[in-house]
Amino acid sequence: PGLTLILLVLIPLMWAMPIGLYCSELTNLAPVESGPYVWAKMAFGEFWGFSFGFWMSMAAYLTGSAYVVLAMDYIGLFVSMSPAMIFIIKAAIIILFTIVNLRGLQEVSILSTIFSVIILIAFAAVAFVGMANWQYNPMDPVIPQGEGVMSSWGTGIAVGVWMYCGYVTISFLGGEIENPKVISKGMKLGIVIIALSYILPTLGGIVSTGPWTEWGITIDYSSVLYQHIGPWAGAAFMIVAVIAQFAIFNASIATASRSFMVLGQDNLCPKFLSKVSPKRKV
């Protein structure tokens, strides 16, 4: 648990902040749609620009589908469903958020903001309740007994980097943001809020709910509310966990689609991927 908390502090400073700042500054200097593709093409030529843009778009779509699966996994903890029903609900989720994205970036933004507020309130509750019921030393041990230092750091960094990824995606929307100068300020504030939303609830969970060896197996963030408030609070947090997956999926559709659109306009992808609606320009 100790190493987890250390990495949750270090990785935002050494990984998330540099990526977030360079993406926000470049978006401010060259506010275009599919920014990473355009910037790479400007710096290294069409081949590497296409490669970078295509890889980023594919990664966004593939990881986006994972969030739908995760949402159904959370729902499956409470409701028993057949494989056919699971497939139907997954398809319905995809269709729903595709419709939201077809409405426009403003609608995506409004929904994402609502989701974000709900998520932050839930994690703030975990942090507050956990630290109010402090029972365990969060730094004992720093590294589990019998585990190698290198393997512990390697695994922790790999997971931590994944947790703090995604900041580059804002640059895919640079061409549609009225005032790109706000991105830099928003990015700095966003990274701080995200880091705290990881660090404080994790600290609250470790110090209030044990043993730490059961975290990720039989104990999670919802367990903090379940044990110290009641079953209803734990169930409510699991609903928020589903909402969190919806929020990420909703945003990933918006960002990934912009890259394919610009690639299509440059004749590097099928042209139909660059088609926009005449009314909403989506």
Where are the regions a protein language model picked out?
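Extracellular loop-to-transmembrane helix junctions
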Residues: 1-81, 85-89, 186, 190-196
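Junctions where cytoplasmic loops transition into the N-terminal start of transmembrane alpha-helices
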Residues: 3-8, 114-118, 174-206, 263, ...
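Select transmembrane alpha-helical segments in multipass membrane proteins
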Residues: 6-7, 45-58, 90-93, 147-158, ...
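TM-loop-TM module centered on a large, flexible mid-protein loop between adjacent transmembrane helices
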Residues: 38-40, 45, 77-78, 188-252, ...
